Amino acid sequence: MSTKNRSDKSSSSSITKDKYTIILPTYKERENLPIIIWLISTELEKCFIDYEVVIVEDNSPDGTLEVAQQLQKIYGEEKIKILSRPGKMGLGSAYMDGIKKSTGNWVILMDADLSHHPKFIPQFIEKQKKLNCEIVTGTRYQSGGGVFGWNLYRKLTSRVANYIASVLLTPGVSDLTGSFRLYRKDVLEKLITQNKSKGYVFQVEMMVRANQLGYQVGEVPITFVDRIFGVSNLDSGEIVGFLKSVLNLFMNIE
Amino acid sequence: MGASDKFIGFVMVLFRIFVFGYYTTWVIITPFIVSDHWIQQYFLPREYGIIIPLVLLVVGITAIGTFLGLVMIKSKKNK
């Protein structure tokens, strides 16, 4: 199965020119959106990468949609596409809808809250070309990567969560809960349709399924910066929820 | 903040190496050293080599179990 995947990929990528679609799910990101778009365009144009951004807007009350429309006027409809949805419907469906609007053959998933810096995207692409793999994930847990803006408690929880998940699920990836990743489009579509988890475990399941289907995953060290505007928190209920769904995943994957 | 976290991590790793070394010496090496050798005074009687880890394990599992139980009860009440 994996050999078949590999051969049809190498033939298609050598003929067509690669285009990268960045899917940005947004909810209440009016301050961050102009900055992230500007960073994406400067970083990617520096490396002559053919790209587009799909903003999946979940009807934020703070007017993120208007900001997105203004940005579209500035950068052009070729570069920025907007998908307006009636409300929050989950990460999986946001990515799925984003894929339908995308025209690239590769998809980059990242957060719009500035915790992921677009300067790593060229490194992702380079890594993918070098390894000829289907997926590249950003990792905080390799030399050169890291987290900024978290206290010791938050760092420890994240480490332990990753450790538990990797012991139970053995996916062979160092950062399971990260959400800054590059996928070949058809691979991403396939993985999302199989994915039943929510929240942090959604990202875990993507890696586990990829491993199960025999896709190769490359890793690039990234620095994660905790959100500057707005808050992200982790309460004890979330920790238990994470453990439950990892256990659930463990039972359901053979 | 980053530097002090690194320091704490460094101390944790040192502690772990120390415990590993000490316990290994205690449980694997000291039984082969004569009982009146000076080094024996730095180690407790050997049965504690089982008792201490066992107690830590029971306490640890109880703590985790209580935490999980409390959170589950709380989340059920909220519903």
Curated annotation (Swiss-Prot), chain A:
Its main location: endoplasmic reticulum. It is found in: Endoplasmic reticulum. Its EC number is 2.4.1.83. One of its GO terms (molecular function) is dolichyl-phosphate-mannose-protein mannosyltransferase activity. It catalyses: a di-trans,poly-cis-dolichyl phosphate + GDP-alpha-D-mannose = a di-trans,poly-cis-dolichyl beta-D-mannosyl phosphate + GDP. Pathway: Protein modification; protein glycosylation. Binds 1 divalent metal cation. Mn(2+) binds at D113. It is an enzyme of class 2 (transferase). Mg(2+) binds at D113. InterPro entries: DPM1-like, Glyco_trans_2-like, Nucleotide-diphossugar_trans. It holds the Pfam family Glycos_transf_2. One of its GO terms (cellular component) is endoplasmic reticulum membrane. GDP-alpha-D-mannose binds at P25, Y27, E29, V56, D58, D111, A112, D113, R140, R227. One of its GO terms (biological process) is dolichol-linked oligosaccharide biosynthetic process. Its cofactor is Mg(2+); Mn(2+); Ca(2+). Keywords: Endoplasmic reticulum, Glycosyltransferase, Magnesium, Manganese, Metal-binding, Transferase. Component of the dolichol-phosphate mannose (DPM) synthase complex composed of dpm1, dpm2 and dpm3. Transfers mannose from GDP-mannose to dolichol monophosphate to form dolichol phosphate mannose (Dol-P-Man) which is the mannosyl donor in pathways leading to N-glycosylation, glycosyl phosphatidylinositol membrane anchoring, and O-mannosylation of proteins; catalytic subunit of the dolichol-phosphate mannose (DPM) synthase complex. Belongs to the glycosyltransferase 2 family. This is Dolichol-phosphate mannosyltransferase subunit 1. It comes from Dictyostelium discoideum (Social amoeba).
Curated annotation (Swiss-Prot), chain B:
Keywords: Endoplasmic reticulum, Membrane, Transmembrane, Transmembrane helix. It is a multi-pass membrane protein. It is found in: Endoplasmic reticulum membrane. Pathway: Protein modification; protein glycosylation. GO terms for molecular function: enzyme regulator activity. The chain crosses the membrane at residues 8-28, 50-70. Pfam families: DPM2. GO terms for cellular component: dolichol-phosphate-mannose synthase complex; endoplasmic reticulum membrane. One of its GO terms (biological process) is protein glycosylation. It comes from the Eukaryota. InterPro entries: DPM2. Belongs to the DPM2 family. Regulates the biosynthesis of dolichol phosphate-mannose. Regulatory subunit of the dolichol-phosphate mannose (DPM) synthase complex; essential for the ER localization and stable expression of dpm1. Component of the dolichol-phosphate mannose (DPM) synthase complex composed of dpm1, dpm2 and dpm3. This is Dolichol phosphate-mannose biosynthesis regulatory protein. It comes from Dictyostelium discoideum. The lineage of its organism: Eukaryota, Amoebozoa, Evosea, Eumycetozoa, Dictyostelia. The gene is dpm2-1.
